[in-house]
């Protein structure tokens, strides 16, 4: 019984940390892959960055250039990355929706 209660408390703490991580990634799609799309070179999710690869490869988010939102919008950019080095849709717009 003790093991079960510790597992359920750990699972609830993971859920709360996941939601805080999802809210930390500005303009990204919510999910386990989009931990923080602002990690990497360039500015992802602000719509004003000029670096290439605005979203970090480690999180599997969308790799974008020109500051387009990697996961939720940007022009022709739908970021659904898979795996540690997965690239989502490659977008090159400057618009964030």
UniProtKB/Swiss-Prot annotation:
- A GO biological process held by the record: sorocarp development
Disordered, as annotated region? 1-23, 62-97
Gly residues bias (residue ranges): 62-74
- Classification via InterPro entries: HssA/B-related (IPR008455)
Q: Which spans does this entry mark as compositional bias, Basic residues?
A: 75-88
Family to which the UniProt record says this protein belongs: Belongs to the hssA/B family.
Specify the protein name: HssA/B-like protein 32
Q: Which gene encodes it?
A: hssl32
């Amino acid at each position: 019984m003790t093991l079960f209660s510790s597992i359920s408390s750990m699972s609830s703490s993971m859920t709360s940390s996941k939601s805080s991580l999802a809210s930390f990634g500005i303009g990204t799609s919510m999910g386990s892959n989009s931990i923080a799309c602002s990690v990497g070179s360039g500015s992802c999710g602000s719509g004003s960055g000029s670096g290439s690869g605005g979203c970090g490869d480690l999180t599997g988010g969308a790799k974008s250039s020109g500051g387009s939102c990697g996961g939720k919008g940007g022009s022709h950019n739908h970021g659904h990355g898979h795996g540690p080095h997965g690239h989502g849709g490659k977008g090159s717009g400057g618009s964030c929706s």
